A protein has these predicted regions:
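Glycine-rich, aromatic-lined ligand/substrate-binding cores of catalytic
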Residues: 131-134, 148-149, 153-170, 176-194, ...
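C-terminal helix-rich "cap/oligomerization" subdomain common to oxidoreductases
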Residues: 3-8, 212-213, 240, 249-250, ...
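Rossmann-fold dehydrogenase core element
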Residues: 44-62, 81-86
């Protein structure tokens, strides 16, 4: 009775069991990404969440920056015109050294790059661009052996995709991208402009608008400030910036609001199931070396 909510921050192989038990006890649930270790786990968890009617949410914190929230607003308002292209990556180098010992992240397909890093950028793509209808994926294990055991999943992967809107896309994910510490970045092209964002410079975006004299056109940097979503509670001065932990605070606030209002906030389990569906399709595509229609998986 003293437990008011459950936060799941374990390896994803344990997410389903904890979530199912929490919903059975009538507790709201916040689950770290990815939702489950497999599409079956994610589907079962979502069904339980929907049946319970309890507040639920999944932790995709990187999309919470004021900069990325501003990009969502630009796109929703049609500021870039018809969007034609999305390019995203989530690249890090924490396993670039083949002498780094194997850990739980090196075992099981759900813990590889497609299960660990890809969900963050796939979530961004869905949030910014809308549903993905088809994709082609390939993945590879770069370092097959490490101290402590063999590696049983992918070190890097790439996805070509088509969105329901008709836009094309490409995403790349890597945990062996030498020199890249937090390469969560994306660029979006539209008929009236383009925008790009890089998590390593999370307090700004680069925006291009197809307007004005040709001689004065170009990408311009926009520093986030109180005029942008969720910035002012942290600082009243533009350009001073927010940090990584502030993204966590923003999503924690939304989960507390979900509990207070007794309704799920974005991204809910239902929203996050769409990320799991894309990951599942990517795994099938990589195994079959063929395009996969999301409606078929």
């Amino acid at each position: 009775p003293a437990v008011e909510a459950v936060i799941i921050a374990t390896p994803q192989t344990e997410h389903r069991e904890i979530a199912m038990a929490a919903f059975a006890e009538g507790k709201p649930v916040f689950c770290e990404k990815p939702l489950g270790a497999s599409i079956n786990d994610a589907t079962e968890m979502t069904d339980a969440a929907e049946a319970s009617g309890l507040p639920n949410m999944v932790g995709f914190n990187y999309i919470r920056t004021p900069a990325s929230q501003f990009v969502r607003k630009l796109l929703a308002n049609g500021e870039l015109g018809k969007v034609t292209w999305f390019r995203g990556e989530h690249t890090e180098d924490f396993l670039a050294d083949p002498q780094t010992p194997a850990s739980w992240r090196c075992r099981g397909m759900s813990n590889g790059t497609l299960g660990d890093l890809a969900p963050h950028m796939i979530n961004a793509a869905l949030a910014l661009m809308g549903p993905i209808c088809s994709l082609l994926c390939e993945f590879e294990t770069v370092h097959k052996e490490r101290p402590g055991g063999d590696v049983g999943n992918d070190d890097h992967a790439q996805i070509m995709c088509r969105f329901d809107s008709g836009a094309m896309g490409h995403m790349y994910f890597s945990r062996v991208a030498t020199g890249r510490k937090m390469g969560y970045a994306y660029e979006i092209h539209g008929t009236k402009g383009s925008v790009r964002f890089d998590q390593e410079d999370q307090n700004s975006i680069w925006l291009y608008r197809s307007e004005g004299p040709e001689s004065e056109r170009g990408f311009r940097q926009i520093l986030t400030g109180p005029a942008h979503p969720d910035y002012e509670p942290f600082c009243q001065g533009p350009g001073h910036g927010t940090g990584y932990q502030d993204q966590i605070i923003i999503e924690a606030r939304d989960f507390l609001l979900a509990i207070e209002e007794n309704k799920s906030h974005w991204p809910s389990f239902k929203d996050s199931l769409q990320v799991s569906r894309v990951v599942n399709a990517a795994l099938k595509s990589g195994e079959q070396r063929a395009w996969v229609d999301l409606l078929s998986v």
